[in-house]
Structure formats: structure tokens, C-alpha cells
Amino acid sequence: MNKQVVAKRYASALFEIAKEQQLLDQLEQELRVVKQVFAQNETLLSVLNHPKIALAKKKALVQEAFANISTVLQHTLMLLLDRHRIDIVNDLADAFIALANEARGVAEAIVYSARPLTEDETNALADVFAKKVGVDTLRITNIIDKDVIGGVKVRIGNRIFDGSVSGKLARLQRQLTR
């Protein structure tokens, strides 16, 4: 079965538990930390996936590495180890965050700009694009991209709104070459 499909099932179950126990915000933050730890330490995932390392050692390693997270998330990680599914932890985190955002009416956006955006510019973009995509709140991550030249390019999910100078130039070039 596809890793993302499996991850969505685990994320859905974890999401229901989080709602029942009112741990939605806490688990979302903890999953972001877990995802970051796995991203920064690629050897951790390879050790946890290694077939010759005993399951007890893997569990001890996870308990030590993530001692400060909630027991619900620790149990989820142990379950993933038991079922040899620890490699889906990043997909699980992404799916859980998407479910949590959907429940709150929040979307995540990446804004590419030639320079760092001010807080006022970020808030203005969040207000405008939140209405366009039909959410209450838009969380913006600003990425500096000198290729943008000017303006901004906004990515929300799989939708891209390109108001950048480079995007306008590319569209103009396509029109002129037809």
C-alpha cells in the first residue's frame, strides 16, 4: 500500500484521539518537532529501519530521543516501530497537520519574494489570500528568492498565484513567441 495512504490512516486515527483528549495544538507542535528531528538527523531513520537492530533497542532510542513528547505520540511512534512503518513518520506529520489545519480553517502558504516581507505586508497577504482560498487564517512562510525580481509568488497547497515580475516576464515571453 502507498506510504501516503497508510500515513493518512495513522494521521486520521491520531487526529481523532487528539480531538477527544483536546491535544490538537500540542500534538501538532510535537509532530513538527519530530519531523524536524528526522529531517536534521537522517541516520536516525536509517537506524530505526535497519533490520539487524533489535526492536527493543529501537524503542529505547525513540524513547530517549523523544522523551519530552506526549505519551500519545510516543505510543504512536512505538506502534510505527512495531509495524515496521517508522519510515512514514514525515508523511504522518504532514497529514496530521493538514487535518488539524482543515479543522481550524487554517491554510499554510509559502510566499516567495525578492526581499524579506514586513509584518504588515505578511498580514495583508494573509488577509487577501485567506479570502481567495476560503479559510479563516493563512500561515505564511516567507522564502527569499532573488529570481522573483519583484512582487510575490504565493503557493497554497497545490495552487500557485504568481504576481512576480519574473512570472509576468515569462508569460509575456510565451505570448510573444506564439
Swiss-Prot record:
Membrane topology classification: Peripheral membrane protein
One MF term in the entry's GO annotations: proton-transporting ATP synthase activity, rotational mechanism
GO cellular component, one term: plasma membrane
Record key words, sorted: ATP synthesis, Cell membrane, CF(1), Hydrogen ion transport, Ion transport, Membrane, Transport
InterPro entries hit by this protein: ATP_synth_OSCP/delta_N_sf (IPR026015), ATPase_OSCP/d_CS (IPR020781), ATPase_OSCP/dsu (IPR000711)
Keyword Membrane: yes
Keyword Cell membrane: yes
Superkingdom field: Bacteria
Subcellular location: Cell membrane
Main location: membrane
The family this protein is said to belong to: Belongs to the ATPase delta chain family.
Function text: F(1)F(0) ATP synthase produces ATP from ADP in the presence of a proton or sodium gradient. F-type ATPases consist of two structural domains, F(1) containing the extramembraneous catalytic core and F(0) containing the membrane proton channel, linked together by a central stalk and a peripheral stalk. During catalysis, ATP synthesis in the catalytic domain of F(1) is coupled via a rotary mechanism of the central stalk subunits to proton translocation.
Oligomer and partners: F-type ATPases have 2 components, F(1) - the catalytic core - and F(0) - the membrane proton channel. F(1) has five subunits: alpha(3), beta(3), gamma(1), delta(1), epsilon(1). F(0) has three main subunits: a(1), b(2) and c(10-14). The alpha and beta chains form an alternating ring which encloses part of the gamma chain. F(1) is attached to F(0) by a central stalk formed by the gamma and epsilon chains, while a peripheral stalk is formed by the delta and b chains.
Protein name as catalogued: ATP synthase subunit delta
Protein's organism: Anoxybacillus flavithermus (strain DSM 21510 / WK1)
Gene name in the database record: atpH
